């Protein structure tokens, strides 16, 4: 009887696939949210969730074990100090994959992978709203300055 395939191959050799997933995991730890293809996001989710579960132990052995895959000391420190502190009480499900529109060049399925508990801190809607308010203040301020300059010229 034919069994299902255990993982996506992503069109790469085993070593290249492992390196790709480790790099995506490192970038996810550093940036808390990354945009990639849907298949890579789903495979990265498997890798990063196992790493976070190991990191929750907080032992030196866990650090060394994770350092085999993530060769960035800054990312390891962030994982053990910030990420584990945020998701320490959660039993799995540390990340979410949000599907996006297809990529323009090749119509590949795109997705965002992010940490669940960091979504409020990096939501783009909040930053856009504040930038619109800042722009409105600048525009109003410039109109006042133009009026003041016009009056002084008279």
Swiss-Prot record:
<keyword id="KW-0689">Ribosomal protein</keyword>
<dbReference type="GO" id="GO:0006412">
    <property type="term" value="P:translation"/>
</dbReference>
<feature type="region of interest" description="Disordered">
    <location>
        <begin position="125"/>
        <end position="154"/>
    </location>
</feature>
<comment type="subunit">
    <text>Part of the 50S ribosomal subunit. Contacts protein L32.</text>
</comment>
<dbReference type="InterPro" id="IPR047859">
    <property type="entry name" value="Ribosomal_bL17_CS"/>
</dbReference>
<dbReference type="Pfam" id="PF01196">
    <property type="entry name" value="Ribosomal_L17"/>
</dbReference>
<dbReference type="GO" id="GO:0003735">
    <property type="term" value="F:structural constituent of ribosome"/>
</dbReference>
<dbReference type="InterPro" id="IPR000456">
    <property type="entry name" value="Ribosomal_bL17"/>
</dbReference>
<dbReference type="InterPro" id="IPR036373">
    <property type="entry name" value="Ribosomal_bL17_sf"/>
</dbReference>
<comment type="similarity">
    <text>Belongs to the bacterial ribosomal protein bL17 family.</text>
</comment>
<protein>
    <recommendedName>
        <fullName>Large ribosomal subunit protein bL17</fullName>
    </recommendedName>
</protein>
<dbReference type="GO" id="GO:0022625">
    <property type="term" value="C:cytosolic large ribosomal subunit"/>
</dbReference>
<keyword id="KW-0687">Ribonucleoprotein</keyword>
């Amino acid at each position: 009887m034919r069994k299902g395939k255990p993982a996506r191959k992503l069109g790469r050799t085993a070593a290249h696939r492992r390196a790709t997933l480790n790099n995506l995991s490192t970038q996810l730890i550093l940036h808390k949210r990354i945009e990639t293809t849907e298949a890579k996001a789903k495979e990265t989710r498997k890798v990063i969730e196992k790493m976070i579960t190991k990191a929750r132990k907080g032992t030196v052995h866990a650090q060394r074990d994770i350092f085999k895959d993530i060769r960035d000391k800054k990312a390891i420190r962030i994982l053990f100090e910030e990420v584990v502190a945020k998701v320490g009480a959660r039993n799995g499900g540390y990340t979410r994959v949000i599907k996006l529109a297809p990529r323009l060049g090749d119509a590949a399925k795109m997705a965002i992978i992010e940490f669940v508990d960091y979504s409020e801190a990096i939501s783009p809607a909040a930053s856009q709203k504040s930038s619109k308010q800042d722009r409105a203040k600048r525009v109003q301020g410039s109109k006042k300055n133009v009026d003041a300059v016009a009056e002084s010229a008279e």
